[in-house]
Amino acid sequence: MNGAVTWTMTGSGYLNNSQLFDGNSKPTGTGLAFERDGYGVGLNDDEITTTPMRQEWIEVAFSSPVMVSAFYFLDLFQARTGGTLEIGQASIDGGAPVSLVAVDLAGTGAAGFVAAAFQPIYASVIRFTVLNSNDNLGYADGALAGIELAPVPVPAAGLMLLGGLGGLAMFRRRARA
């Protein structure tokens, strides 16, 4: 594999990202393209949905641990009447979940975009779901928009650089002599 990390995405049902982005404005500063409306579960649904009877999920597994530094969701909304809102969750390697709480009001044309950025942490498996809270329109749902990966530091690179500089210094001394 030459150091390449691969990933697989599975879900509690059919994975779907066929819905075009439908927000009235694209959030900036994330590096996301916002061409699609995120990943969801279901043949006719582009969202991860939770009902009183079931909780859908999406899981992303990496072939080797990667450093994750942010999660992005779309279609998480607050009820227009206040009080209730949708909450996306991401759990790294089965640990305590990171919660992404809706900030956009439902029915306003907003994208329902929520981001959670944090200090990079190693992850092999990330599970995404939505809590059974709601925006009072249908069921609690949201879509996985992205995972941000941080560069992985290479500890040996520093030693190689120092070794190379030391070799150059020694070569230079020999050339002067």
Q: Model-predicted segments: where are they?
A:
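N-terminal targeting leaders for non-cytosolic proteins
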Residues: 1-54
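An amphipathic, hydrophobic-aromatic interaction surface with interspersed Lys/Arg
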Residues: 51-61, 76-77
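Extracellular and analogous surface-interaction loops
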Residues: 56-67, 117-121
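A short beta-strand element within beta-rich, extracytoplasmic domains
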Residues: 66-79
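Short, surface-exposed beta-strand/strand-loop-strand elements in extracellular ectodomains
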Residues: 79-95
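Terminal, low-complexity interaction segments
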Residues: 95-151
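Short, threonine-centered small-residue motifs that mark membrane-proximal processing/anchoring sites
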Residues: 141-169
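C-terminal membrane-anchoring or membrane-association module
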Residues: 169-177
